[in-house]
Structures are given as structure tokens and as C-alpha cells.
């Protein structure tokens, strides 16, 4: 049986994203789209699809469908990597810039509201604990 902590963390992520999702509705972005755009914006420029999939925590085939949709909307471009022709580099387009600004403002405002009443020290402790949990899980996965 899963520990209550795992369920609590999963529920927290689900309701956190649902709140942001609701607030981003006017921008006509699905959760998959805004999570992908947010990660592209946060990562260093010209990330590969593989790096982006890892950052988001999804499989590459799922990401490709989302990137196809974002490319159709003119929000990203993909270019073949010079050093590896099988790899694609992802870039936000100029058309995406105002949308990203609005999206990031909504996300930042929502995060600030969610974290209201939590001190900087408490937040730092939480971040440290989450990093430790992630490290332990990655080590356990590596062991098989």
C-alpha cells in the first residue's frame, strides 16, 4: 500500500496544476501545452526533445504530439541538430513571447498565493526535503 505521503504529494501536484489550468483557461492553453511551454521557457535555449521530455517527466512520443500541436499554433520551432541529425532542438517563436509573458505572470502570481503564509525558511526546508526524496527514489530506481 502506498504511504499517505506519496498520495498527499500526488494530490498536491494534481490540485496545484488544476488551479493553474483554471487560471490559464483564458489563454486557451491545455495543461499539456502550458507545462511544455513553461519548461521550454525555463530551460536553457535550444534544448533537445530528449532533454525536454526528461525535464517534464514524460516519454518522448507523448512530447512529440504536444510539440506538433505547439508548432502548428506557431509557438515553437524545431530544427535538426547539427551534431546529430536525428535530434531536434526546440525554440520558442516570437509569436510565443507575449503568451509566455502572460502565462508566466499567471503561474508566478498563483505560486505566490499558494505559498502565502509559508516563511522563506519553511520553503527552503520543503525544497530540501523534496530533493532528498527525489534523490532516494532515483537511487532506488537505479538499483532495480
From Swiss-Prot:
Residues 2-135 form the HTH marR-type domain. Gene3D superfamilies: Winged helix-like DNA-binding domain superfamily/Winged helix DNA-binding domain (1.10.10.10). Keywords: Activator, DNA-binding, Repressor, Transcription, Transcription regulation. One of its GO terms (molecular function) is DNA-binding transcription factor activity. It comes from the Bacteria. GO terms for biological process: response to stress. Residues 49-72 bind DNA. The keyword Transcription applies. InterPro entries: HTH_MarR-typ, MarR/SlyA-like, Tscrpt_reg_MarR-type_CS, Tscrpt_reg_SlyA, WH-like_DNA-bd_sf, WH_DNA-bd_sf. SUPFAM superfamilies: Winged helix' DNA-binding domain (SSF46785). Homodimer. Belongs to the SlyA family. HAMAP family: HTH_type_SlyA. Transcription regulator that can specifically activate or repress expression of target genes. This is Transcriptional regulator SlyA. It comes from Shigella boydii serotype 18 (strain CDC 3083-94 / BS512).
